[in-house]
Amino acid sequence: MQYAMHESDAAGGRLFECPEFTQRVRLIAGEHLDDRCDEVLYVLTGSGTATVDGHEHDLRPGTALFVARGTSWTATGDAHAVSVLVHDPAPAAATHAVVDLTAVQPGEATAGREFLLGATPEVGCASVTQFVGLIPPGRAPDHFHRYDEVIYVLDGEGVLEIGGEQAPLRSGTCIHLPRTLVHCLANTGDSELRVLGVFTPAGSPAEAYYPDGTLAVLPERN
């Protein structure tokens, strides 16, 4: 299979798994310890508090949370999040990190697209980059990345185009894109399409390549 898609209206449980990741939507509350996987989360709804290494952190929509494997932590409240377990992670530089993506300045990608960075090596998460992609109406050229990626559609409407075939995208759609797979996420609506992405190896969400292997560069601004 070149890629995988899944849709679920469920507020918990596993969505799907690939060799690099397990992606699911779940209630964060409870006691947690994973000795095998790093975990990166993005809060969708609700609120609460996460306590990691004696530090308390508020959880609300737009909060990104990274917890390294072997780190015990607890959470309270009714916050639900997209959780991505990172299989066989590299040693982390920190036990955890919290980023408020509502306060992050966007970076620029191709075709007028922007992104907000969550968990990254800069905050101690060595294995992956987590981001929210902001996709305006329209279509970018076909391209590929040199990383494996899982995507969760936060809101908006669009299509995933691969090899001349299209699959609809809407809130709750989950996608796994293997590295070097030529594709395009097109926004077919009249408002912004927002997607949550996590990819490995870590890098920049703006790095993309056209099908002939040339680097897709940012267009010049007047």
Over which residues does each language-model region extend?
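A short, N-terminal "cap"/entry segment at the start of jelly-roll beta-barrel domains
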Residues: M1-E31, H80-S127, P211-N222
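Ordered, small/hydrophobic-rich secondary-structure cores
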Residues: M1-T71
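Short, conserved beta-strand element in jelly-roll/cupin
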Residues: D35-A50, V132-P136, F144-E161, V198-T200
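Structural motif
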Residues: S47-T49, E56, S72, V150, ...
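Ligand-binding loop in jelly-roll beta-barrel domains
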Residues: R69-A93, S171, R179-P205
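Short acidic-glycine-tyrosine-enriched beta hairpin
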Residues: G54-G70, G163-T180
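Short, structured motif recognition centered on aromatic/hydrophobic residues
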Residues: Q23-V25, V40, L44, L59, ...
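Short histidine-centered beta-strand/loop micro-motifs
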Residues: L15-E17, A29-D35, T76, R139-H145, ...
